[in-house]
Amino acid sequence: MNTPSQLSLPLYLPDDETFASFFPGENATLLAAIKLAINQPHGSYIYFWSRDSGGRSHLLHAACAELSLKDEAVGYVPLDKRAYFIPEVLDGMEHLSLVCIDNIESIAGDEEWEMAIFNLYNRILEIGRTCLLISGDRPPRQINLKLPDLASRLDWGQIYKLQPLSDDEKLQALQLRAKLRGFELPEDVGRFLLKRLDREMRTLFMALNQLDHASIVAQRKLTIPFVKDILHL
């Protein structure tokens, strides 16, 4: 059993992946639904999906961070990293205020894990006090699960598609993250990054973090020549 503010797994939650740093774009409805769900006294369930995993994990990290600040007990389970833990880690999670399950598609075909998630879902449903957030890379019915009952359970409740950001929205998301970190990302530099790098937000944010550190060390503002030098572009 977890005590308040502890995570069920000894995993690092990025301190810059909060609700404040999430640029919603066309996902304002999903963001509002998650904020409402995690603050309800009774149980709730939301499933959301997208091909880009970065935004999904960001929202789950943000939900965990939000409730941890209120001394609520939360659990975050990244199923793409399940090689590092066993299904029994889910035991007792039905007593937490929030359970976030990331990358549900990763367990497709793994009967032991499918049954463990199914049983946890049922326990959460029975007790009725836990908010359950699950993310995947496709709608529930398109995941090739061996356990039909789990596929049916995942299809209950609220289901959202996390809409991708446009290039202009990605630029705004990068500038927001830079502002929260205490530096400025000029528009021309941001557009250069979008043009030269993989457009997945996780890749862009990693580059932004690298540039932030390099600019502090070099005591320089971000310019295109500086970015080219640091990122070897």
UniProtKB/Swiss-Prot annotation:
Signal peptide: none annotated. Belongs to the DnaA family. HdA subfamily. This is DnaA regulatory inactivator Hda. One of its GO terms (biological process) is negative regulation of DNA-templated DNA replication initiation. Mediates the interaction of DNA replication initiator protein DnaA with DNA polymerase subunit beta sliding clamp (dnaN). Stimulates hydrolysis of ATP-DnaA to ADP-DnaA, rendering DnaA inactive for reinitiation, a process called regulatory inhibition of DnaA or RIDA. It comes from Photorhabdus laumondii subsp. laumondii (strain DSM 15139 / CIP 105565 / TT01). It comes from the Bacteria. The active form seems to be an ADP-bound monomer. Forms the RIDA complex (regulatory inactivation of DnaA) of ATP-DnaA, ADP-Hda and the DNA-loaded beta sliding clamp (dnaN). The gene is hda. InterPro entries: DnaA_dom, Hda, Hda_Enterobact, Hda_lid, P-loop_NTPase. Keywords: DNA replication, DNA replication inhibitor.
